[in-house]
Amino acid sequence: MQHTLKKSDFFYELPEHLIARYPLQNRSDSRLLVAAVESAQKVHISNKQMIDFIDFLKPEDLLVINNTRVVPARMFGHKISGGKVEVFIERLLSEQRVKAHIRASKAPLLGSQIVIGAQKVTIEDKKDGIYTVFSEMPWTKLMAQQGKMPIPPYLARDAEALDSERYQTVYAQIAGAVAAPTAGLHFDQKLLERIAAKGVKRAAITLHVGAGTFQPVRVENLNEHVMHQEWFSLSQEVVDAVAACRAQNGRVIAIGTTALRALESAAIGSGKVGVFQGDTDLFITPGYEFQVVDALFTNFHLPESTLLMLVSAFAGVNNIRRIYQHAITEQYRFFSYGDAMFLPHRLPALETLL
């Protein structure tokens, strides 16, 4: 009998010391766990290094990356009355308006002002706990002056100078994310050049990762979970690259869960995608029928997170449990600054359930 999925199905114990609080000296120094799933109960695991990733690629393959750029979204200021305030930008709406989370001892009132640096910003609206905030000075300029890199809360430290470079992919272009597409952090220019020299193609989507990626799932029954929305753009160039990959019997390989989410959200059938620009709230859990993505390169994700549910949909709940247990035993480094895993193919949807 099919098991109704619960949040607790995705819990695992992680020793505290395996959380990578800082990046390694070089991006491509990471270890790489390669997990070839054969059935719902069988997975072949091998321990490799990031530089070995190229050996698992064929010239016909297509890597799809996310070229979003993380903005320094965390800012500190004070109310006109003097109370301290933390502003965490969730989304840029325009040059002068943002959606933001605001932490203060007392919630700011609509119409009130906050001082960030020398700039006054105005609270215009509040919906579902998120504020719309207006600034005369363009927010990108204000963030450049006052913002700090929005590193994940589980790093349990303040952002440092190194995070400005290392919590950003080398191919980051389009500003708008408030969290990094962390699978991409493992790639340096040299590795990308070696992959290209093998004939492997590359295409870029843009998905602005939101603060929702850090929000815990608050319900036990996953059918009741409301997935956060993220804006993405998928161009004709990507549409053509996916079609060309299909014509050559190559694999569409998502570099990260954000690239996967964009590709699957833009699926139009027959393994193809269409041009898209807008929001997605796609929530991928075991039993999901993948339309586009054939292989997934990703990091190790938090217990009970929507990202762990996504990789379980790709490789199977039981297989992911085995893979993660192996990673813990072998002392892999976890989360954003941690090591990587590669799933060279996926399971049929029905086999991914418990």
Swiss-Prot record:
Segments passing through the bilayer: none
Pathway: tRNA modification; tRNA-queuosine biosynthesis
Enzyme class label: transferase
N-terminal signal peptide: none
Molecular functions per Gene Ontology: S-adenosylmethionine:tRNA ribosyltransferase-isomerase activity
GO CC, alphabetical: cytoplasm
Pfam families, per the entry: Queuosine_synth (PF02547)
Enzyme Commission designation: 2.4.99.17
Gene3D superfamilies membership: QueA-like
BP-aspect Gene Ontology terms: queuosine biosynthetic process; tRNA wobble guanine modification
UniProt xrefs under SUPFAM superfamilies: QueA-like
Catalytic activity field: 7-aminomethyl-7-carbaguanosine(34) in tRNA + S-adenosyl-L-methionine = epoxyqueuosine(34) in tRNA + adenine + L-methionine + 2 H(+)
Entry keywords, A to Z: Cytoplasm, Queuosine biosynthesis, S-adenosyl-L-methionine, Transferase
Cited function: Transfers and isomerizes the ribose moiety from AdoMet to the 7-aminomethyl group of 7-deazaguanine (preQ1-tRNA) to give epoxyqueuosine (oQ-tRNA).
Similarity comment: family membership: Belongs to the QueA family.
HAMAP family: QueA (MF_00113)
Summary of subunit composition and partner proteins: Monomer.
Name of this protein: S-adenosylmethionine:tRNA ribosyltransferase-isomerase
Organism: Dichelobacter nodosus (strain VCS1703A)
Species classification: Bacteria, Pseudomonadati, Pseudomonadota, Gammaproteobacteria, Cardiobacteriales
